[in-house]
Design a protein with these regions (language model features):
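Hydrophobic anchor at the beta1->P-loop junction of P-loop NTPases
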Residues: 12
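ATP-dependent small-molecule kinase phosphotransfer cores
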Residues: 38-157
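Hydrophobic positions on the alpha1 helix immediately C-terminal to the Walker A/P-loop
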Residues: 23, 27
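P-loop (Walker A) phosphate-binding loop of NTP-binding proteins
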Residues: 15
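Phosphate-binding P-loop
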Residues: 2-7
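Short helix-capping segments at alpha-helix termini
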Residues: 32-37
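A glycine- and Lys/Arg-enriched "phosphate-lid" helix/loop adjacent to the NTP-binding pocket
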Residues: 139-208
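Conserved lysine of the Walker
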Residues: 20
């Protein structure tokens, strides 16, 4: 039996304000409360690890000094690879650290690197028979990348290069469906500071991509 087969990997996907971030902890709590014998773990992307902090800081428009600090920390954790991936990620991190705008595909590379570095934790949880309930995973990369004009081919190729054999396919993906209009209305009412992925136009295109 492989490590992955010992536990279950369940992902909730959806547009901004779809309610998935509410449903994930509820699902974890219900699995625990109903004495199913399943130990459930709540997880989400972007993570709170180095590349996840870079991604979040960039899309939220954080000050350059903070971007520089988190980008340098992530760069120190890069492992050299002969396929050019580490050089590419280093270049993207340097641009972010200088406060420069990066392309959408380069931003998605940071999300992918965050996913890659987090897979060891997911594999460990699964190996111990835990159910990992994840708020966003690879489909978010595809949906929001496509919504901003990146080709599916480029996204798939880079995802394969960065994650390689570390890629984990979910046992179940649940799409929490709401319309782009409802998502935009909820976002406006929430008072939340929006990031660059949360414009009404991108939300509409992400709905189509999903």
């Amino acid at each position: 039996m492989s490590e992955k087969e010992k536990g279950k990997f369940i992902v909730l996907e959806g547009l901004t304000c779809s309610g998935k971030s509410i449903q994930v902890p509820l699902l974890v709590a219900n699995l625990t409360r109903k004495k199913t014998g399943i130990t459930a773990v709540l997880d989400s992307e972007p993570t709170n690890e180095s590349f996840g902090r870079v991604a979040r800081a960039y899309i939220e428009g954080s000050p350059v000094a903070f971007l520089d600090r988190v980008a340098k920390r992530a760069a120190r954790e890069l492992v050299y690879s002969s396929d050019g991936v580490s050089r590419k990620l280093t270049s993207v991190l340097e641009c972010i650290g200088r406060g420069e705008r990066i392309s959408i595909i380069d931003l998605q590379l940071i999300f992918m690197a965050d996913r890659m570095r987090h897979t060891d934790k997911i594999y460990d949880w699964l190996a111990f028979g835990k159910a990992v309930i994840m708020d966003r995973y690879a489909l978010s990369t595809l949906a929001y990348g496509l919504a901003q004009g990146v080709s599916i081919g480029d996204l798939v190729v880079w995802h394969g290069l960065i994650l390689g054999k570390r890629k984990i396919d979910p046992d179940l993906t649940i799409y929490v469906r709401i319309s782009a209009r409802t998502a935009a209305e909820r976002l406006a009412m929430s008072g939340k500071i929006t990031d660059i992925n949360e414009t009404e136009e991108i939300i509409k295109k992400a709905e189509t991509a999903y």
